[in-house]
Structure formats: C-alpha cells, structure tokens
C-alpha cells in the first residue's frame, strides 16, 4: 500500500510539473507543433478509405488538434469528439465536423450537440500530459481514456494516437 501511495504522489508531482511547463509554452511553439502534426496527418498509419477519427476539444494548455482534424475532414475521414457520460464511465463519441457548434460539457470542454449521431471511432486521438521513450503515457489521472480504450477494444480493433508536446 505504501508503494502505491508513493506512485500516486509521484504521478501527482509529475503532472503538476508538466502542466507548469506547458503553461510556459509560447503561442508560436504551440502553433508550430500543431501545424507539423497536421502536415504529417495520419499518413504513418497507412489508413485506407474513410475512417472514423475521434479528436478532442483542446483545453487551453493542451496540444491543438484542430488543424489535424481539418486536414482529416478534407481527406474524407468522418470525425467525432468525445462526450463525458459521468465520472468513472467511458467516453461516448458523437459525430462532428469543422464548423459544427459545440456545447460546453464537464470542465468546460467542448462537446458535440446531443442531436449528433453516436459513432464508434476507428482511430482515437488522445490528449496526453506526457509520454516516455517506450510509449508509456501519463494522462490527467481520471482514467477516462483507459476505460474508453478498454470498451472500444472489446468491440473492434482500434488505433490510439497520443498527442503531447515534446520537451
């Protein structure tokens, strides 16, 4: 039990340090990172045909995913954004396209309107606080994406792509 609380505390401190670092990033750095990822697109996945790709409504200090989503929309992919269903529950996904209005959900995060179709993504873009060289990710600690990936992978193969800033 003591080790577990040490790990929890270590993660809490790491999250605070990374959030402070991200808050210090200048607008130019943030924009260049978003443009670089949008220029790459999802070419590295060698996706054939139209996939359902779920992005996320970026929080102020998160990676800006909008340029990538606009590119994917132009390429013919169907887009979705997550919707919070409540604490300790997996995310739900509703169809979204650039220009669609968003409602403010939990924590002020933009979510598609309730009349948008529920969809199951093939590719999930995941916001990360951090990652390491082995690909292990550090999220915000709520477990939403862990639960969501577990649910989706029980239904079908799904690809998750983490997006974060690199120091």
Q: Residues of each region from the PLM?
A:
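N-terminal active-site beta-alpha-beta segment that forms phosphate/nucleotide-binding
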Residues: 2-122
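Conserved phosphate- and dinucleotide-binding cores of soluble alpha/beta proteins
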Residues: 89-167
